Amino acid sequence: GGPRRPKIIYFIGCNNVRVQDVTLRNSAYWTQDYEKCNGVIVRGVKVYSHANWNNDGLDIDSRNVVVSDCYIDCDDDALCLKSDTDTPCENVTVTNCVLKSNCNAIKFGTSSYSGFKNVTISNCTIDRASEDHIRQWYKNYPWIGTKHKTVVAGIALESVDGGIIENVSISDIAMQGVQTPIFVRLGDRKRTFSKQMSRINDVMISRIIARSEGKIACSITGVPGGDIKNIVISDVILVTDAEVAKTDIDLKVPEAIDKYPENRMFGTILPASGFYVRHVNGIAFNNIKMTTTNKDERPMFHLNDVKNFTQQGCTLN
């Protein structure tokens, strides 16, 4: 950011903000940012931004926010909730949006100092961006196994700076062209305001249809001494195209406690075709229907230091 790379829209510390029916194109930095505001409505906003690095579509670090009916096509994260200050990003509802990205479509983080509370996201579609001049994951990270431009993660929930993610519902999402449909990461990178371990509690992800490309499975991972707690994932149809032999599977996944959170952060092919779960206390998988279109010899689930795990109605074809 700064004077050399301004955002197109930037509200900070404002009350009762409404942005509606505008088109924003090719920002120098983040396209629009709402920081420490109270009472924000963003409706019917169209974003097309593929001019620079850091071309996020919509960044929210505010309270009492409604986002609806937006079309976002950008190079960096499409919808990004941030927590850069000493107050949490909370009471946020997002619905009826089209999200296209070369990075993450729905993301909490990376900045996660205070956290994210009471958030619902529903009725959205996710797809690969229209352009890819910068990232080109298929060229720069060939081990991922993608052949085209892709979204990094459809849903990425990241708390790594001492903040908390709690009371979150994400539902009715259709996604295609993604590397990893669901990425949940509790890390221990920085502690500024809370001086305590990051936390992720009470999250529900439901009614998801996803077509993924490449070898990086979904992952839900905490760190030693920092468990993710009370996660429910239900009613998911997942179709993957990964081709992985048993000899390619690496059971020694590094902890990467303070690394930048991203689906490829472990630097290896995860030992699950569906969900790799580690350092979690309380997780339920209900009605997960997974289909592999190529020969993937990994099991659907791989668990490491997981307590109170349940699964019901989960199938792998």
Describe every region a protein language model picked out.
Residues G1-N317:
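Extracellular/periplasmic carbohydrate-active domains that bind, remodel
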